[in-house]
Amino acid sequence: MIDENKQVNHTSQQLGESTEVKQAIMSESPAQINNNESTNEVTESVAIPTNVVGDTTATEDNGFTATQIQEANTAALAELTQQINSLKTQLDERSTQYMRIAADFENYRKRTQKEKEELDLQVKRNTILELLPIVDNFERARSHLKPQTESEMTIHKSYQGVYKQLVDSLKRLGVSPMRPEGQEFDPNLHEAVMREPTDEHPEGTVLEELVRGYYLGDRVLRHSMVKVAAPKEDTLPAQENQSSPADS
């Protein structure tokens, strides 16, 4: 019982002290509160410049000056300019190499295409040259053989039909015959195998085609064998020489 009374008294004392503190706080005047707030505002206003000055000092200590920054920018710009010039030089070199390679490839393509065309033409030419003697034999047979009976005419028409098919096939391949009669002799087209003295045609005129020549496209496939006009020999000097001994 004694202990419980002590605890009750102690609790009452604490409550009394709390009440006194509250009354002291409530008894403070509004003017005093206003003064305290003004003092806090002044303190904060004074502290702000101090912080700004401190920040500025820190920036100057940890950063670079304007001159150093400008020098660094100038150096970086110079380095970038040098890199750009170097890249431009490399680009020009690569472009030149590309153009050279492209030109070489185009020349190679044209050369191989021309070689292929020449090879194809040579194969075609050799094949057609093997067929031309057959055409010559057909033409000789047509000019020399004169069918007399109906059976001979039938045979003549049959092989002439084969001849016509062969000639048509050669035309489709680009083969065309020469027509040299009456033209001036051209060693690039004709081969002179005979000369006939005559005063009816100028010297060097082709009088007759003995073996027909052919073109393959615009090229000579086979030269034409021809007879060429020659100047007629004058017999007057020989007659005078023969009459001179008789006079003596």
From Swiss-Prot:
InterPro entries: GrpE (IPR000740), GrpE_coiled_coil (IPR013805), GrpE_head (IPR009012). Its main location: cytoplasm. One of its GO terms (biological process) is protein folding. Keywords: Chaperone, Cytoplasm, Stress response. It is found in: Cytoplasm. Residues 238-248 have a biased composition (Polar residues). GO terms for cellular component: cytoplasm. One of its GO terms (molecular function) is adenyl-nucleotide exchange factor activity. This is Protein GrpE. It comes from Trichormus variabilis (strain ATCC 29413 / PCC 7937).
